Curated annotation (Swiss-Prot):
Record bears the keyword Amino-acid biosynthesis: no
Catalytic activity of the protein: tRNA(Tyr) + L-tyrosine + ATP = L-tyrosyl-tRNA(Tyr) + AMP + diphosphate + H(+)
GO molecular function: ATP binding; RNA binding; tyrosine-tRNA ligase activity
Domain S4 RNA-binding as annotated: residue spans: 362-429
Keyword field: Aminoacyl-tRNA synthetase, ATP-binding, Cytoplasm, Ligase, Nucleotide-binding, Protein biosynthesis, RNA-binding
UniProt-recorded name of the protein: Tyrosine--tRNA ligase
Binding site for L-tyrosine: 32, 172, 176
Gene: tyrS
Subcellular location, record wording: Cytoplasm
Residues where ATP binds: 235
Provenance organism: Phocaeicola vulgatus (strain ATCC 8482 / DSM 1447 / JCM 5826 / CCUG 4940 / NBRC 14291 / NCTC 11154) (Bacteroides vulgatus)
Transmembrane feature ranges: none
Length: 430
């Protein structure tokens, strides 16, 4: 498999230094990609870079995932409009450990293969590097004129914020450049990959290597992922879509991919899955014949959810989706854990009732009219129940004066009332 050809048909090549493809064709190459450890989880904005490393390893080359323990303590100005908060060493070590665990789902760190993946942390070689060492070994090789010409620097200096660029952030490109030099000298690393906003930092590293020891190295960047409507990829109203289920439940993760537009699904299925070109072309053709069936979105959501979480989490997410949008049973509803239940019914009207009252038993008509205003009046509720239009926990309410107790609670806390086909209400016992 040819790595550059693989990335090209997937739409994952933005800029490539001349000679990169020739280098990859003649030898097993070691390449690295930097990951910012400012959180203890990756989010889907990291996924394109991680998939580059995955394809790189599958093509027989050796991937290095560099977590910027040192550079993360400073913050990269590329694409940023303001200074970043600095992280403590303890926080960074925790974040790095969590990120490695997530990367292990995409990369082979364990085998004896010569191209097994490695995780490196630039804090390990920067922590004892004094400022005088840095000035002598790195600073003297790159001119301020060269550094000032970078887009990331110019954008901050001329930006609307008018708060300039700190010396700390200005030197970031030299620190990242030194990473490339260090990995070139210690690991034989000849290629750096990253997002297109990293091109300036990557070429600084290549220039540093050329000026210090005459070495020739290469660079390849992927496009920054966007949405067809111009919105920011990977962001929702509630923030990032994280890979860690503590921050984004597998159900919400699955729903994100399931709900992308047709245009985005056609691009994302190439970038975020390992499906072959033939499989993608077949799915795209099938989708074009019946777009309403959302074949691309369903397959995209399946592939990414299984890869990031598990087959079990994917199946649970599909089942949970059916509860809101299909004819699910009460058994399926009872199987949901609390986090998924709340994720599925996020945004539906919620009411609180007394747990003590439920312990003694309350007539449904009193509970859902007086205690929780699900219905406007007892007469309205009686009429709907008689017409079979009210369900409790996905089972038809048999009588409007049926007694409800704590035994009816889901997860010992919730009652799900359904009025008609589409109106849901969540009643919480407190």
């Amino acid at each position: 498999m040819n790595f550059v050809e693989e990335l090209t048909w997937r739409g994952m090549v933005h800029t490539m230094m001349p000679g990169t493809e020739e280098l990859l064709a003649k030898e097993q190459v070691t390449a690295y990609l930097g990951i910012d450890p400012t959180a203890d989880s990756l989010h889907i904005g990291h996924l394109c870079g991680v998939m580059m490393l995955r394809h790189f390893q599958r093509c027989g080359h050796k991937p290095l995932a560099l977590v910027g323990g040192a550079t993360g303590m400073i913050g990269d100005p590329s694409g940023k409009s303001q200074e970043r908060n600095l992280l403590t060493e303890e926080t960074l070590r925790h974040n790095v450990a969590c990120i490695k665990k997530q990367l292990a789902k995409f990369l082979d760190f364990e085998s004896d293969a010569p191209n097994k993946a490695e995780l490196v942390n630039n804090y390990d070689w920067m922590k004892d590097f004094t400022f005088l060492d840095f000035a002598r070994e790195v600073g003297k090789h790159i001119t301020v004129n060269y550094m000032m010409a970078k887009d990331s620097v110019q954008k901050r200096l001329n930006g609307e914020a008018r708060d300039g660029l700190s010396f700390t952030e200005f030197t970031y490109q030299l620190l990242q450049g030194y990473d490339f030099l260090h990995l070139y000298e210690t690991k034989g690393c000849k290629l750096q990959m990253g997002g297109s906003d990293q091109w300036g930092n990557i070429t600084t590293g290549a220039e540093l290597i050329r000026r210090t020891n005459g070495g020739e190295v290469f660079a390849l960047t992927c496009p920054l992922i966007t949405k067809a409507d111009g919105g920011k990829f990977g962001k929702t109203e509630s923030g990032n879509i994280w890979l860690d289920p503590r921050y984004t439940s597998p159900y919400k993760f699955y729903q994100f991919w399931l709900n992308v537009s047709d245009e985005d699904a056609a691009r994302y299925i190439k970038i975020f899955t390992s499906l072959s070109q033939e499989e993608v072309e077949a799915l795209t053709a099938e989708h074009a014949e019946a777009p309403h069936l959302r074949v691309l979105q369903k397959r995209l959501a399946k592939e990414v959810t299984v890869m990031v979480h598990s087959e079990e989490d994917y199946n649970a997410a599909v089942e949970a989706s059916g509860i809101l949008f299909g004819n699910a049973t009460s058994e399926a509803l009872k199987k949901l854990d609390e986090d998924t239940l709340l994720a599925v019914f996020e945004g539906v009207p919620q009411f609180e009732v007394s747990r003590d009252a439920l312990a003694e038993g309350v007539k449904a008509v009193d509970l859902f009219v007086d205690n929780a205003a699900v219905f406007a009046s007892k007469g309205e509720m009686r009429k709907l129940v008689q017409g079979g239009g009210v369900s409790l926990n996905k089972e038809k309410l048999s009588a409007f004066d049926q007694v409800i107790t704590t035994a009816d609670l889901l997860d010992e806390k919730y009652l799900l009332v359904q009025r008609g086909k589409k109106n849901y209400y969540l009643v919480i016992a407190k």
